[in-house]
């Protein structure tokens, strides 16, 4: 029947997984709702591991649907995904989340944003296209984690977005392999050189964020790994399927 392609969207309100054939006809799909937590006024946070669990469940539903329709899940050539570009979690050396996933709806960084913006800096607009900080920027969430998360201060290794977090777990990657694509990079708001598609050491120094915490920047179509045996068993797709 030809090659199939699996994609997911790890969004604010749901995780959606779909499989398409080579003519871009949808042949299977499934979605599950996400959970938004509001622990304090102005705070909005999620669970990165719920994103992984929902994706795995949706993938299993899709592989079952494919089999019912006479398709072979082993024909899936690649697994791809996108998610929330203005949201991050902190991970440990094993690649596991040790902080909540804070997204763009959160405003806990308002005072810090006001403090940053009290000193106008030309570099923000020149390098990122954003003239000032905003509560929705992951750069500000990173500053908050570095100041307020004991878990990250003790064991934190990288900051990652939700889609890369899911893809890392599907491929069994550790923090040393943490990544972000150059489209999602723009969601950071500050801390990068948009034209060069690299992190800005000068901006990160101003922000007080050590570059060691930043994931490597890849092309959106780069292959990051292969579906592990464990995830193959859980999802019903073939071990070794490319993850990108």
Specify the residue positions occupied by each region the protein language model found.
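Active-site metal-coordination/substrate-binding segment of hydrolases
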Residues: 112
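Metal-dependent DNA phosphodiester-chemistry modules and their immediately adjacent helices/loops
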Residues: 121-123
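Gly/Ser/Thr-rich active-site cleft segment
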Residues: 10-12, 125-244
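Conserved donor sugar-nucleotide recognition element shared by glycan-biosynthetic enzymes
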Residues: 48-51, 55, 109, 138, ...
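N-terminal glycine/serine-rich phosphate-binding loop of ATP-dependent small-molecule kinases
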Residues: 1-100, 115, 215-216, 232-242
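Hydrophobic side chains within alpha-helical segments
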Residues: 85, 109, 141-144
């Amino acid at each position: 029947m030809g090659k199939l392609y699996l994609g997911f969207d790890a969004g604010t309100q749901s995780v959606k997984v779909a499989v398409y054939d080579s003519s871009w006809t949808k042949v299977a799909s499934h979605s599950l709702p996400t959970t938004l937590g509001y622990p304090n006024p102005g705070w909005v946070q999620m669970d990165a591991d719920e994103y992984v669990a929902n994706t795995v469940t949706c993938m299993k539903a899709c592989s079952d649907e494919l089999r019912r329709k006479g398709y072979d899940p082993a024909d899936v050539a690649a697994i791809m995904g996108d998610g929330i570009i203005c949201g991050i979690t902190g991970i440990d050396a094993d690649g596991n989340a040790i902080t909540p996933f804070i997204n763009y709806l959160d405003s806990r960084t308002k005072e810090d944003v006001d403090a940053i913006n009290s000193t106008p800096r030309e570099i923000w607009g020149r390098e990122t296209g954003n003239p000032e900080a905003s509560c929705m920027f992951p750069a500000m969430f990173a500053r908050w984690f570095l100041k307020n998360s004991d878990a990250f201060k003790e064991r934190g290794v990288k900051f990652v977005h939700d889609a890369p977090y899911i893809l890392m777990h599907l491929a069994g990657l550790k923090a040393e392999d943490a990544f972000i694509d150059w489209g999602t990079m723009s969601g950071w708001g500050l801390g990068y050189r948009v034209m060069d598609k690299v992190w800005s050491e000068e901006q990160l120094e101003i922000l007080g964020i050590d570059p060691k915490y930043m994931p490597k920047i890849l092309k959106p179509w780069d292959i990051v790994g292969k579906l592990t045996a464990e995830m193959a068993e859980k999802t019903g797709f073939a071990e070794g399927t490319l993850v990108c």
